[in-house]
């Protein structure tokens, strides 16, 4: 699991991007919301769960998980209590006959 800080200036808010399959920080580097630090997470060959205290300095945390990042967020962000969470185009079951890509296709 790779972590890349796009912004780490001690802002009051954090946007935690759990990026999708084959994506890295370049996918969102054009974003610069005022008042937010931004952490991108990708390359999920190894998973390292986040501890709650990792983000305790922030007044608010927004979790944005996209594609395969939805699966990774479900496994690594269990102790993170975001103020807002968005899962876009993904599932906690990426290879699943009912909720994801059918096993015969994958």
Describe each model-derived feature in a short phrase:
Residues 16-18, 64, 88:
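Short hydrophobic segments within beta-strands
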Residues 22, 69, 91:
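Catalytic metal-binding/acid-base residues of hydrolase active sites
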Residues 27, 72-76:
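Hydrolases whose catalytic domains are alpha/beta-hydrolase-1, hotdog thioesterase
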Residues 38-42, 83-88:
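Short hydrophobic/aromatic-enriched beta-strand-loop microsegments
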Residues 84-106:
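Flexible "cap/lid" loop of the alpha/beta hydrolase fold
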């Amino acid at each position: 699991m790779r972590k890349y800080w796009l912004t780490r200036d001690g802002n009051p808010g954090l946007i935690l991007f759990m990026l999708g399959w084959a994506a890295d920080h370049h996918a969102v580097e054009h974003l610069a919301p005022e008042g937010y630090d931004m952490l991108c997470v990708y390359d999920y060959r190894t998973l390292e769960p986040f501890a709650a205290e990792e983000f305790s300095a922030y007044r608010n945390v927004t979790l944005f998980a996209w594609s395969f990042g939805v699966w990774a967020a479900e496994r690594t962000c269990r102790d993170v209590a975001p103020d807002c969470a968005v899962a876009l185009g993904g599932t906690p079951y990426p290879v699943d006959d009912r909720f994801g890509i059918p096993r015969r296709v994958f």
